[in-house]
Amino acid sequence: MKVGRFLVIIAFCFYVLYLEKIIHTRPHKKCDWRSWEQWESTGNPVRIALVADPQLVDDLTYDYPRPLIGIVKWISDQFLRRHWRYLHKSLKPDITFIMGDLMDTGREFATEEFKKDYFRMMNVLDPKFTNKLEIYPGNHDIGFGNHAIVKDIQRFESLFGPTSRSIDVGNHTLVIVDGIRLSNNVNPQVYQPARDFLKSFETNKDNSRPRILLSHVPLFRPAINSCGELREKDDVIKYGLGYQYQNLLLPELSESILKAVEPIAAFAGDDHDYCEVVHNYQVDTREAATTEYNVKAFSMTSGILYPGYQLLSLNYPYDNPKADQKSSYQTKLCILPNQIQIYVWYGASISIFFALILLRTAIFFFGTDRYSLPLYKTHARRFSLSTTIHLFKKIVRITLSTFISYTWIPFLLFIFLNIFII
């Protein structure tokens, strides 16, 4: 093997390694807890990863031919699987929350279809990589409001526990409030458990523990409230609704949740993009304020360029309710790479390299005496159509052979890195 060819192959291997490994592990390393936590030496922080809207692509997601939907499922699953593993291997959070919308059309599935995609999800988002995993539903899992599906709620709770619940950890109470079921007002079987749960916080307030509100659908805010500079799409979230969908809880419900829980911070999913707003409200005669963070979608098929997740660090080493609870949490947005852009880089690189080999091969053939252009008209040769076609086929055949000889090793490396995600 010539030295030049060897160096080109090595360069391609490093290129593949960068696009398949380094570019994917780097965001998680940049989010290392020690790089952004600013706690004093007191206490031992509890570290939490918030993962929103994985929305596994399924057979009903896109109106594509079956082979194409299979490719899209494989690519999107690989992205989720890769970053799920890298997140937990790099950051090792104490608890991981999946904040709803596990599958794209899970609420439409019959039992057998659901089982099939449930096991697929457990393979992609493998719980064995987590220290502790908590999952609650989104509208893609159980429907929304008056159209929430009872059998889907029962199925979800049988697998993952109550859709509204609280978890005490690190001297904090994490309060999962099911705004989807609270938005129902026609079926007591749907709304009553969620209302009872919320009422229990309203009547039995223990202010010694700071509370963090977790939900799927964000709380209501005026359409003029800016989401901040970290958002990709429009600067605001405007109220909207559709089939089994509502992008903000209603104002009255939002206020009742805030008053009942009185959280020091709130986190929601559903919107797919980042948003940070402050909710001001009154509890009795007191003025209160809560910052709500919308967590980016974890999926590459969620309509944003850069998926992500949120880290939450809790540190409240006090039993004194008068201690400063607002400063007991810190949070960090972690942004994942643009997978579509990576495939564009692959496509551009392959196209340019193939074109260069084709050009070099063509120059070689047309530069030889046999195929060179005549210097004088008297030396003109007549090229038949069959000769031209034969020459073209020969150039393409040699170009392909040369291209494969340079790229088969990098291609095997690509396959290896996708089969064995390390």
From Swiss-Prot:
Keywords: Endoplasmic reticulum, Membrane, Signal, Transmembrane, Transmembrane helix
Cellular compartments annotated: Endoplasmic reticulum membrane
Residue spans crossing the bilayer: 339-359, 402-422
Membrane topology: Multi-pass membrane protein
Signal peptide as annotated in the record: 1-19
InterPro entries assigned to the protein according to its UniProt record, in alphabetical order: Calcineurin-like_PHP_ApaH, Metallo-depent_PP-like, MPP_Cdc1, PGAP5/Cdc1/Ted1
Pfam families assigned: Metallophos (PF00149)
The keyword Transmembrane is annotated on this UniProt entry: yes
Alphabetical GO biological process terms: GPI anchor biosynthetic process
Gene3D superfamilies linked to this entry: 3.60.21.10
Cellular component GO terms, alphabetical: endoplasmic reticulum; endoplasmic reticulum membrane; membrane
GO molecular function: hydrolase activity
Predominant location category: endoplasmic reticulum
Name of the protein this chain belongs to: Uncharacterized protein C630.12
Organism for this UniProt entry: Schizosaccharomyces pombe (strain 972 / ATCC 24843) (Fission yeast)
